[in-house]
């Protein structure tokens, strides 16, 4: 499959599947496919949970309601065990992060050629369907968490308290202020960077493995048979990966915001 309709080499096939549909150039490049799927899945999440919430009954719940309630209770218990402050925003935020990230990760379960082939038939040359394999998406979410950390740190501790936290820890001496400021600034900035890169790295690697396995289908029958076995095995294992990465992103967000609420 190729944008020009010609057969691709293995290298070209891999590159094609790792290329976003984009407009603009340089810093102002917009990845249309990542935005479409991330926003679309976010809207689907809101619609689904709102629909279940409106139809919730005290009687015998349906399967979908049971599933949603199970997710909500799991996230709520995770917040209660981890977050030590009082903030009604944290639980809904954690639920949104967990479900939204999981849904974006779950797009990696779709066979790698299905949606790109449909896009090609419609005249669209590139189509990446897993938003969390786009560093722009993972960094956008991580920066959002980072801004919340700064906001609640200042709201709870005040500007002076926040500045003291940056300048008087871990060494409580005026002479160590430059060292403290350097250490705390690096620690603070490392939080969104680690959030973004961890999610991106795991999902990008998972997608690349699916693409490499898909290449085997174009070889002889022996490699094609092996490819089916490998894809099934990796699919089962990857379900654990995508769930775990959504959980880790949620838990680290809760931990970071809990730390922001701690008034030293």
Curated annotation (Swiss-Prot):
GO biological process, one term: proton motive force-driven plasma membrane ATP synthesis
A Pfam family matched in the record: ATP-synt_A
Gene3D superfamilies reported for this sequence: ATP synthase, F0 complex, subunit A
Name the UniProt record assigns to this protein: ATP synthase subunit a
Top-rank lineage group of the source organism: Bacteria
Subunit structure: F-type ATPases have 2 components, CF(1) - the catalytic core - and CF(0) - the membrane proton channel. CF(1) has five subunits: alpha(3), beta(3), gamma(1), delta(1), epsilon(1). CF(0) has three main subunits: a(1), b(2) and c(9-12). The alpha and beta chains form an alternating ring which encloses part of the gamma chain. CF(1) is attached to CF(0) by a central stalk formed by the gamma and epsilon chains, while a peripheral stalk is formed by the delta and b chains.
Parts of the chain that traverse the membrane: 29-49, 89-109, 134-154, 177-197, 208-228, 235-255
An example Gene Ontology CC term for this record: proton-transporting ATP synthase complex
UniProt xrefs under HAMAP family: ATP_synth_a_bact
Species of provenance: Shewanella woodyi (strain ATCC 51908 / MS32)
PANTHER family: ATP SYNTHASE SUBUNIT A, CHLOROPLASTIC (PTHR42823:SF3)
Topology in membrane: Multi-pass membrane protein
A Gene Ontology molecular function term of the record: proton-transporting ATP synthase activity, rotational mechanism
Subcellular location field: Cell inner membrane
Entry keywords, A to Z: ATP synthesis, Cell inner membrane, Cell membrane, CF(0), Hydrogen ion transport, Ion transport, Membrane, Transmembrane, Transmembrane helix, Transport
Function: Key component of the proton channel; it plays a direct role in the translocation of protons across the membrane.
Family named by the database record: Belongs to the ATPase A chain family.
Coiled-coil region list: none
Keyword Flavoprotein appears in the UniProt entry: no
Gene: atpB
């Amino acid at each position: 499959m190729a944008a020009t309709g010609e057969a691709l080499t293995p290298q070209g096939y891999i590159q094609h599947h790792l290329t976003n549909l984009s407009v603009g150039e340089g810093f102002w490049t917009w990845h249309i496919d990542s935005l479409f799927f991330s926003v679309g899945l976010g809207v689907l999440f809101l619609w689904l949970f709102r629909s279940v919430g409106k139809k919730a009954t005290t009687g015998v719940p349906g399967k979908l309601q049971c599933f949603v309630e199970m997710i909500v209770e799991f996230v709520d218990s995770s917040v209660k065990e981890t977050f030590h402050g009082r903030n009604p925003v944290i639980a809904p935020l954690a639920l949104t992060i967990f479900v939204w990230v999981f849904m974006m990760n779950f797009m990696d379960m779709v066979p790698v050629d299905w949606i790109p082939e449909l896009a090609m038939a419609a005249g669209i040359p590139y189509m990446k369907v897993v938003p969390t394999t786009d560093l722009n998406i993972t960094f956008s979410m991580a920066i959002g968490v980072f801004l919340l950390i700064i906001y609640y740190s200042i709201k709870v501790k005040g500007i002076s308290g926040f500045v003291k936290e940056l300048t008087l820890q871990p060494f409580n001496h005026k002479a160590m202020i430059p060292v403290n400021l350097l250490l705390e600034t690096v620690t603070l900035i490392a939080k969104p960077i680690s959030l973004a890169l961890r999610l991106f790295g795991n999902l990008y690697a998972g997608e690349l493995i699916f693409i490499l396995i898909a290449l085997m289908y174009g070889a002889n029958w022996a490699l094609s048979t092996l490819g089916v076995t490998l894809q099934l095995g990796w699919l089962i294992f990857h379900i654990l990966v995508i769930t775990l990465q959504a959980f880790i992103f949620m838990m680290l967000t809760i931990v970071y915001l809990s730390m922001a609420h701690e008034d030293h």
